[in-house]
Amino acid sequence: MATCIWLRSCGARRLGSTFPGCRLRPRAGGLVPASGPAPGPAQLRCYAGGLAGLSAALLRTDSFVGGRWLPAAATFPVQDPASGAALGMVADCGVREARAAVRAAYEAFCRWREVSAKERSSLLRKWYNLMIQNKDDLARIITAESGKPLKEAHGEILYSAFFLEWFSEEARRVYGDIIYTPAKDRRALVLKQPIGVAAVITPWNFPSAMITRKVGAALAAGCTVVVKPAEDTPFSALALAELASQAGIPSGVYNVIPCSRKNAKEVGEAICTDPLVSKISFTGSTTTGKILLHHAANSVKRVSMELGGLAPFIVFDSANVDQAVAGAMASKFRNTGQTCVCSNQFLVQRGIHDAFVKAFAEAMKKNLRVGNGFEEGTTQGPLINEKAVEKVEKQVNDAVSKGATVVTGGKRHQLGKNFFEPTLLCNVTQDMLCTHEETFGPLAPVIKFDTEEEAIAIANAADVGLAGYFYSQDPAQIWRVAEQLEVGMVGVNEGLISSVECPFGGVKQSGLGREGSKYGIDEYLELKYVCYGGL
């Protein structure tokens, strides 16, 4: 049986033994063989080789501040959402550690801003290369801590690395302007300068990509960062810190302060209100985003917010049913429905409704397989925790009580408390929770509509507007709907729209600013106007 050689050699005594493939458990004074099988359903107890052989250097449990690995006064557990088993104990940073990280980032900023764009570009490229070299290990870390199917985790690592590659190139494309003024003896210059220390707060659903999308832009611009990763998935952020160090990113430029859910509020407030922080970048819920905006307002900090969504997926009568179903599958069930751009409500025109629902249900039954993310063939892993399952369950029960029909799924999965069956509902009406509350799970509610105007009205009724999708073969309709949807991103006959080259962000209460693309670096730059006279 495979054993955890990486755990035996890494010296990280706080690591738990229940990573898939692991047969050792830590105790005071050393590591001893496991006394028995890990708890949970038999199918989830152990996946030999899941993390066995993982690079020891990548599995870190301390905070990373000023180029050093530092413990905290306390630790908190990180669990495998598939089995509920403890993966390890991680440094539980508090306000003191947060302030120390900000100070380290500020001191580093005074030096990093003077590094040439070419050198910053080179270092980011080295970081990218190391991610590619370690992509298999990084993917396994994601699957272990988030439950995401391994195939999707590999996809995230590539997506994550590509942000470093992209911004390594954008670092050398930060241009200013020369403006000719009415006065003959003057010239006006516009300089773009790094804004300063950025506080970066990231979610659990994309624990690697949401970091590099922000940090790549910040470092390319000449800023330094303090990253507070989600408490459910800190290992990915810490692995990135190790690779950043190996790439030669200077001490203090990239700092990571993991913390428990108990400390998250005060740590978030500490880094967002610190006078040495000039920029806040957050991906998460709209509710938390509003709290951070309040913190930022007191000192008028620059903010980027990528918040909640309620993405509509509209299928018009002219749509190709097979294409629409393929798009619906991709949009809804990636990461088990736990993405901010997942379709949240399906609006299907009356003439195509029955054919779409039938084909959608058949595709779900044929192509979706619930299981542990390390198991080959799994397409739907666990939800991140039982609270997430309870939310999906509540929405399903609410809809059914108000007249919705369960086409397929509809209940918890037998694999364990964090699993829920991929669910399709029809006869859904707008008074149901699932139509105005972001689900973040494998639930697809279908609303029947009659006219284009009706569909647009339903889609735009939300107070958020991140992404929207629609399928149509009518060119005139395509232009009308694309322009009328009140969202930041539109997929036309396409269910997957994210790309490093394209601007990511929303309107209304879905956020502020854009990430990725040529516009992403601007979020970390200040414009300075210089008037040069006496010429």
From Swiss-Prot:
EC number: 1.2.1.24
An example Gene Ontology molecular-function term: succinate-semialdehyde dehydrogenase (NAD+) activity
Gene: ALDH5A1
Binding site for substrate: R213, R334, S498
Protein name per UniProt: Succinate-semialdehyde dehydrogenase, mitochondrial
Coiled-coil intervals, chain numbering: none
Quaternary data: Homotetramer.
Transit peptide: 1-47
Recorded catalytic activity of this chain's protein: succinate semialdehyde + NAD(+) + H2O = succinate + NADH + 2 H(+)
Lineage: Eukaryota, Metazoa, Chordata, Craniata, Vertebrata
UniProt pathway: Amino-acid degradation; 4-aminobutanoate degradation
Subcellular location: Mitochondrion
Modified residues (N6-acetyllysine): K126, K265, K365, K411
Role: Catalyzes one step in the degradation of the inhibitory neurotransmitter gamma-aminobutyric acid (GABA).
Enzyme superclass (EC): oxidoreductase
Keywords: Acetylation, Disulfide bond, Mitochondrion, NAD, Oxidoreductase, Phosphoprotein, Transit peptide
NCBIfam families: SSADH
Family, similarity comment: Belongs to the aldehyde dehydrogenase family.
Modified residues (Phosphoserine): S499
Protein residues bound to NAD(+): R213, K228, P229, A230, E231, G284, S285, T286, T287, T288, G289
Presence of the UniProt keyword Oxidoreductase in the record: yes
Principal place of residence: mitochondrion
